[in-house]
UniProtKB/Swiss-Prot annotation:
Expressed predominantly in kidney and to a lesser extent in liver. Weakly expressed in heart, small intestine, brain, lung, testis, and stomach. Its main location: membrane. Zn(2+) binds at H21, E24, H116. InterPro entries: AspA/AstE_fam, Aspartoacylase, AstE_AspA_cat, Aste_AspA_hybrid_dom. It comes from the Eukaryota. Binds 1 zinc ion per subunit. Residues 1-210 are annotated as: Hydrolytic domain. This is N-acyl-aromatic-L-amino acid amidohydrolase (carboxylate-forming). It comes from Mus musculus. It is an enzyme of class 3 (hydrolase). CDD domains: M14_ASPA. Substrate binds at R63, N70, R71, E177, Y287. Belongs to the AspA/AstE family. Aspartoacylase subfamily.
Length: 318
């Protein structure tokens, strides 16, 4: 698998969104801070625009009010006729589409960085909806800038034809996910780390805009294979939970025959797949309602092509 060559047109319209989920507090408070102190997001060729994506859910300190905003930015929702009974997040998705889009047009923002926290032990994880070369080069840059801190890229290609995330409104985007952090809690270490990583990502965009050479390389990425539900009773209630041997081991190999769940009756449930997978978002609190105990991924080696050098030119923030 390899990604296609990407454009070297400079990225001048960049957004940093936080609070897409209103109880993921690093993004919430970074967005709030930058709305009052935007200088931290300025670079010579562009100034990233901070956005508090879901103000109502943020005020209520909940993931969402009516439906998941990060599943509501489809062209179907964005293009539908507004009604008074529309869910709040659908209304907000349309507002974000006016601000950052319109989705799928040349007028959309060049790049959106969406900030998230998870209760799972993912560490630093970039989530990309495509294997576009720029996103892989970005992840590689962060890995080289932070050799002691694992930074993994999780390729989450939506099933079907429609993308639905907040960053999908722009021409390109990526999600910066960090955990573990409880919902509604702000940890100083993760806050500082996310802030530093955002700075590094904006630095990379600036280097990209100025024509930095981006040679070809190889890297491991994790591609989503689907979800695994908890064991359940005939009535649909939980019959067990994540096994202690699996808990907190995100991005580590899970082999056939190894335990994945501990039933309340005491028995172990073993993984019955026929190949090694790499679980991600293990026991994520927000996924209980989605009937997801963890996501399965495959670890694949990709060859990322070089991006042709951009001849530096005078660029100013629009």
């Amino acid at each position: 698998m390899s990604s296609l060559p990407g454009s070297r047109e400079p990225l001048l319209r960049v957004a940093v969104t936080g609070g897409t989920h209103g109880n993921e507090m690093c993004g919430v408070y970074l967005a709030r801070y930058w709305l009052q102190n935007p200088g931290e997001l300025q670079r010579p060729s562009f100034s990233a625009m901070p956005v508090l994506a879901n103000p109502a859910a943020t005020a209520a300190c909940c993931r969402y009010l009516d439906r998941d905003l990060n599943r509501s930015c489809t062209l179907t929702f964005l293009g539908s006729t507004a009604t008074p009974d529309d869910p709040y997040e659908v209304k907000r998705a349309r507002e974000l589409n006016q601000l950052l889009g319109p989705k799928g047009t040349g007028q959309a923002f060049d790049f959106t960085l969406d900030l998230h926290n998870t209760t799972a032990n993912t560490g630093v994880c970039l989530i990309s909806e495509s294997n576009i070369s720029f996103n892989l080069h970005l992840c590689h840059y962060l890995q080289r800038q932070n050799p002691g801190m694992p930074c993994r890229l999780f390729l989450y290609e939506p099933a079907g034809t429609e993308t639905f995330s907040v960053e999908s409104i722009s021409k390109n985007g990526i999600c910066l996910e960090m955990g573990p952090q409880p919902q509604g809690v702000l940890r100083a270490d993760l806050f500082s780390r996310m802030r530093a990583l955002v700075a590094s990502i904006l630095d990379f965009i600036e280097l990209f805009n100025q024509g930095m050479d981006l040679p070809a390389f190889e890297m491991d990425i994790y591609r989503n294979l689907g979800s695994v539900d908890f064991p359940r009773t005939a009535d649909g209630d939980l019959a067990g939970t994540v096994h202690p041997q699996l808990q907190d081991h995100d991005f580590e190999p899970l082999r056939p025959g190894e335990p994945i769940f501990k039933l309340f009756s005491g028995e172990d449930v073993l993984y019955e797949g026929d190949s090694i997978v790499y679980p991600v978002f293990i026991n994520e609190a927000a996924y209980y309602e989605k009937h997801v105990a963890f996501l399965k991924s495959e670890k694949i080696r990709v060859t990322v092509p070089a991006l042709l050098r951009l001849t530096p030119r005078s660029t100013q923030t629009p």
